[in-house]
Amino acid sequence: MIEVFLFGIVLGLIPVTLAGLFVTAYLQYRRGDQSDL
């Protein structure tokens, strides 16, 4: 049952990782769009 447990963890981490990357890219885009240094 350890394989099922690890599979559940991976399925739970994938959306969180994608959401984190999306938020980071969005914040960098907003920061670059607001201040033109």
UniProtKB/Swiss-Prot annotation:
Keyword NADP: no
GO biological process: cytochrome complex assembly; photosynthesis
Intracellular or extracellular location(s): Plastid, Chloroplast thylakoid membrane
GO molecular function: electron transporter, transferring electrons within cytochrome b6/f complex of photosystem II activity
Membrane topology label: Single-pass membrane protein
The UniProt record lists the keyword Repeat: no
Sorted UniProt keywords: Chloroplast, Electron transport, Membrane, Photosynthesis, Plastid, Thylakoid, Transmembrane, Transmembrane helix, Transport
This protein's GO CC annotations: chloroplast thylakoid membrane; cytochrome b6f complex
Transmembrane spans: 5-25
Disulfide feature: none
Functional note: Component of the cytochrome b6-f complex, which mediates electron transfer between photosystem II (PSII) and photosystem I (PSI), cyclic electron flow around PSI, and state transitions. PetG is required for either the stability or assembly of the cytochrome b6-f complex.
Entry's family note: Belongs to the PetG family.
Assembly behavior: The 4 large subunits of the cytochrome b6-f complex are cytochrome b6, subunit IV (17 kDa polypeptide, PetD), cytochrome f and the Rieske protein, while the 4 small subunits are PetG, PetL, PetM and PetN. The complex functions as a dimer.
Protein name, UniProt field: Cytochrome b6-f complex subunit 5
Source organism (scientific name): Daucus carota (Wild carrot)
Lineage of origin: Eukaryota, Viridiplantae, Streptophyta, Embryophyta, Tracheophyta
Gene: petG
